[in-house]
Regions:
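Short, flexible, solvent-exposed loop/turn segments with mixed acidic/basic and small polar residues
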Residues: 67-70, 141-143
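Donor/substrate-binding cores of folate-linked one-carbon enzymes
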Residues: 1-68, 75
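Charged/polar, solvent-exposed surface patches and flexible loops
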Residues: 34, 46, 70, 90, ...
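An anion-binding loop in the catalytic cleft
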Residues: 76, 81-180
Length: 180
């Protein structure tokens, strides 16, 4: 989190103070937003008195280290299962709670809220990415470009968000079904 001086550019002002906020493997877009808001508020309260008494020396930003983040859109959430299991799991976490990651199941949008990279997934028989390779009582396993992703929490179009074990009470996807 950075507290900076405003100038005419977009996020180009001098840096006043910064604080590193760790991102865990369980963080979602929503939980990270909350963490950053909390850290930013605390940092601002620490910075204002120092700014007022002149004990802060502004630091010019190094433009070579800057990056641009494009706006989030719903289309960004469409899962391409040909990617790596790790990248897809991170996409799902990053887009939780908006715009959310999704695929298609039986012609309907299926939002995926929680997943994890399946253990020993490289031992699974390779299928076309997006193919359901296994269904258990509480999980659906989907082939990705380099392994298998275990779906844990989903939401079918027009329904509420639920654990996969609850989804499976009303739906019986079969191994071999292709999502997308």
């Amino acid at each position: 989190v950075t507290i900076m001086q405003m100038n005419e550019g977009l996020d180009t002002g001098d840096i006043l103070t910064q604080k590193i906020v760790p991102i865990t493997a369980e963080d979602t877009g929503e939980s990270l937003f909350d963490k950053l808001c909390e850290a930013g508020g605390q940092l601002l309260l620490e910075t204002l008195p120092k700014l007022e008494n002149g004990s802060i020396t502004p630091v010019k930003q190094d433009e070579s280290k800057s990056s641009y983040a494009k706006m989030l859109t719903k289309e960004l959430g469409h899962i391409d299962f040909s990617g790596s299991a790790v990248e897809i799991e991170r996409l799902i976490r990053g887009l939780n709670s908006w715009p959310s990651a999704y695929t298609k199941y039986e012609g309907k949008t299926l939002k995926i809220w929680k997943s994890r990279v399946a253990e020993n997934s490289e031992k699974e028989q390779q299928q076309k990415p997006g193919t359901i390779v296994r269904v258990t009582d509480d999980s659906i396993y989907v082939q990705t470009g380099d392994g298998v992703l275990e779906l844990l929490e989903v939401q079918l179009e027009g329904k509420k968000r639920m654990q996969v074990k609850d989804f499976l009470l009303g739906h019986r996807p079969q191994a071999g079904t292709v999502l997308g």
